[in-house]
Regions:
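Terminal amphipathic alpha-helical/low-complexity segments used for targeting or macromolecular assembly
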Residues: 1-167, 292-327
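Glycine-rich, flexible loop segments associated with nucleotide phosphate handling
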Residues: 240-245, 289-293
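A generic local structural motif
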Residues: 163-164, 176, 252, 284-286
């Protein structure tokens, strides 16, 4: 599978940003982001109440202003991106790029996300919205005094996707395992132990019961089995983008650090890294990275010798259960 090329077009969106008392941007929610051509300059600006009413609507204006309980202020913003091929300019810009991914307006790797970790604050994501960590204890006490539920769901730089975007045709059994910036194609089902990071996801109907790490692409009609792991690009200095082709099956508790072409199977419990020594049908032994991206192969471990073998495949492993993907 070819990694989607970075796109040159830009984007424009209006949204609501949550600011800490010191002005730190905790999040920005863009309900209707759009790709745009001819944007002259990248940047973000705070909107007046009148402009917010024009571009967002009265219901959004009513949410603006200070929230004393969390110690934050909610403002309306307009964010413009001249080209998604250039790095993000500010935190609003980062959130817009993550929204574009989860709205399926761009595919993973089509927007430049270099350096975004340094632009995102570590935030307490609560049932009442984002909260600065230095306000968390006071916010909890104020919530108790007001007799309202205040549940801390996560402490992280990335929020849950479904707090901002719920793509059509998708089922997610455990929403805290899908980060904003995940790209889930229509027909995707993410089961309870499935996980999808930002700038990663599915390009067609898929079953996700394992982990799709950052940067990973899974193509149509593929199944990431329970507990299966696909190595990403965030840790360990990895640069290679791992992809899974069409109609592939990763067995339960298997894993890959190489790309799979179409119609491939990795046996349950078998973990294939780039350096794994693999026995070929002719008896020769090669490193698995030499087979990266090949179509129609089965990786399995010999139950007697323990050696990893690769076998050509001419038959389908089956297919996804269509009833599980009518979302």
């Amino acid at each position: 599978m070819q990694t989607p090329p970075m796109i040159q077009s830009g984007a424009i969106a209006y949204g609501l940003a949550t600011l800490a008392k010191d002005g730190t941007v905790l999040d920005t929610w863009y309900p209707s982001p759009q790709l745009a051509e001819g944007v002259k300059e990248s940047g973000s600006q705070v909107l007046s109440e009148t402009d917010a009413r024009t571009h967002l609507g009265e219901a959004f204006v009513k949410t603006m202003g200070p929230c004393e309980l969390r110690g934050v202020n909610v403002v309306a913003v307009k964010t413009s991106i001249a080209t998604l091929a250039e790095p993000a300019k500010d935190t609003h810009d980062v959130f817009l790029r993550l929204h574009l991914l989860s709205h399926r307006l761009v595919k993973p790797h089509q927007a430049n996300l270099a350096g975004i970790f340094g632009m995102l604050a570590n935030v307490a994501w609560t049932s009442m919205g984002p909260c600065p960590l230095d306000q968390l204890q006071d916010a909890r006490l104020r919530a108790r005094a007001a007799r309202v539920v205040f549940d801390v769901k996560a402490v992280d730089k990335f929020p849950y996707m479904t707090d901002y975007v719920v793509p059509s045709g998708v089922r997610i059994a455990n929403v805290d395992r899908v980060r904003l910036g995940a790209h889930l194609a229509s027909g995707t089902t993410v089961m309870h132990e499935g996980f999808c990071n930002f700038n990663a996801g599915t390009l067609g109907a898929s079953m996700v019961e394992g982990r799709i790490s950052a940067g990973v692409l899974v193509d149509d009609q593929s199944d990431v089995g329970g507990g299966a792991s696909i190595m990403g690009t965030l840790s360990g200095g990895g640069k290679e983008v791992i992809s899974v082709g069409k109609r592939c099956l990763l067995g339960a508790n298997s894993g890959i650090g190489i790309s799979l072409g179409d119609d491939c199977v990795v046996e349950a419990g078998c973990y294939i890294t780039g350096g794994t020594r693999v026995k070929m049908p002719d008896g020769s032994v090669v490193k698995a990275r030499e087979l990266s991206g090949r179509n129609g192969i089965l990786f399995r471990r010999d139950s007697q010798s323990g050696a990893v073998q690769v076998i050509p495949r001419t038959e389908s492993w089956g297919s996804l259960n269509a009833d599980l993907h009518k979302n």
